[in-house]
Design a protein with these regions (language model features):
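Amphipathic, well-ordered alpha-helical segments in soluble domains
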Residues: 17, 24, 50, 108-111, ...
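Amphipathic, membrane-active segments
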Residues: 32-74
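Transmembrane helix-loop junctions and nearby membrane-interface residues
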Residues: 21-28, 57-60, 64, 144-151
Length: 212
């Protein structure tokens, strides 16, 4: 009788250990799914806020490119960064290369690049590439606008010392080269925005947000 009792005790202990292990593994899997869901949701909300900015200011991305210096570039920059995540960059475009605004600008660009990489890692399929490319193009557009604003600032400073025509100042600082780079960046951003702005694309992404 004691022999059978020991046997069943061993069996019950083994079953209890197995159940505990199963529950532990299940809890880990659920925890991992929750963490993945949280990461996906956070990145989705951030990129969606930037997409909304591009939607609200689509004319800046699609308007006819003028063959003259863009003296309102700083205002365009502010419009394209006018949300709670990006608004700290307003001072950066108003005071290019000045601290602490310049460091804040560099940090935010790095955050955007990191977000683009993270998007590819936590979302599946080609859909992730569309969004990561959009983030990279957005970051590159801000960089081009910032670089162009430095040129505009130098043109204004030069003109305050030695008044010249706008055409002369443009030639002196190779303004057209930077303007062309700006236009190219804006065109790429428009194309990548058009890709992610499609309803079917967003629906595919939202399906991956479901916690299962």
């Amino acid at each position: 009788m004691l022999k059978y009792w020991n046997f069943w005790c061993t069996v019950m202990t083994s079953i209890a250990a197995f159940i505990a292990l199963y529950l532990s593994v299940r809890q880990i899997k659920l925890g991992n799914k929750q963490q993945l869901f949280d990461r996906r949701l956070k990145v989705y909300m951030l990129v969606n806020s930037i997409i909304s900015l591009c939607k609200e200011n689509y004319t800046l991305l699609s308007e006819k490119r003028e063959a003259e210096p863009q003296l309102t570039n700083d205002f365009s920059f502010i419009y394209l960064t006018n949300n709670t995540y990006m608004e700290s960059l307003a001072k950066a475009i108003q005071y290019p290369l000045e601290q602490p605004f310049h460091n804040e600008f560099l940090k935010k660009r790095e955050d955007l690049r990191s977000m683009a990489v993270e998007f590819e890692l936590i979302f599946k399929g080609n859909i992730s590439l569309l969004y990561s490319n959009f983030l990279r193009d957005y970051e590159q557009t801000l960089a081009a606008m910032y670089q162009y604003q430095i040129v505009i600032k130098r043109m204004k400073e030069e003109n305050s010392k030695y008044p010249r025509t706008l055409e002369e100042l443009s030639q002196l600082f190779s303004e057209k080269k930077f303007r062309d780079s700006l236009y190219e960046a804006l065109d790429k951003l428009r194309e990548s925005y058009d890709a992610v702005a499609q309803e079917k694309v967003e629906n595919k992404l939202r399906k991956q947000l479901v916690l299962i």
